[in-house]
Swiss-Prot record:
It comes from the Eukaryota. This is Replication protein A 32 kDa subunit-A. The lineage of its organism: Eukaryota, Metazoa, Chordata, Craniata, Vertebrata. SUPFAM superfamilies: Nucleic acid-binding proteins (SSF50249), Winged helix' DNA-binding domain (SSF46785). Component of the replication protein A complex (RPA/RP-A), a heterotrimeric complex composed of RPA1, RPA2 and RPA3. GO terms for cellular component: chromatin; chromosome, telomeric region; DNA replication factor A complex; nucleus; PML body; site of double-strand break.
Amino acid sequence: MWNNHGGFDGGYGGSGMGGGGGYMQSPGGFGSPAPTQGEKKSRSRSQQIVPCTVSQLLSATQNDEVFRIGEAELSQVTIVGIVRHAEKAPTNILYKVDDMTAAPMDVRQWVDTDEASCENMVVPPGSYVKVAGHLRSFQNKKSVVAFKIAPVEDMNEFVSHMLEVVHAHMAMNSQGAPSGGGSTVALSTPGRVGDSGRAFSGGNDNPTNGLTPHQSQILSLIKSCKGNEGMAFEELKNRLHGMNVNTIRQAVEFLSNEGHIYSTIDDEHYKCTDGD
């Protein structure tokens, strides 16, 4: 998972972060002493990177320092969403990442103050990202401390992530469920654009091939409008309040030039060519 970004090859299943020995070195550089055999058995799942939705993380229960979703223990997690807000401080960058399943999640990335590396670059709002990090709670507010933030170039990565969420939590709960009964984890997934006016629209009718995430998002919004006049550019701006107006305009022009959409009553109203 994430091999194409040069990130990590852990993920759920197998050996987690690739660690199979008694000492687990975390991506942030902090390790822990080798656990006993019993601790290995009881805490093995927490060493894996678990795909999650923001809704799941916010509803996770905490006992001492251990977070759980149902019977599944987790610490290292991944989420995929759009950056709604970014704020840089001398030692860290605070993001609000929205995957449309709940309120945006606080994601904090610590920066290296000694050198100007790519890790210190601020991801601008409106960008889609995949975040890997540790779930934390401070004063009853959950957040993710990120050790990896990578751009999402293809919206299929979002669909793939949601499938990984379902697979991982079904597998983990089947492993942790007591005999004679199972434990069900509610999976909150983003609604379609036509239902909620939000950004993601996972499903078979999401024509992402060859399009950037912004273009796919705008095309899905236009396709969701069933009126004869189509969707007005002003409405697009209102729906996409986190996206730059010039970015929206450029995406609309591209979609029009490529034949994905066409203008209707004027140059500010658009319909999808295969929306019927």
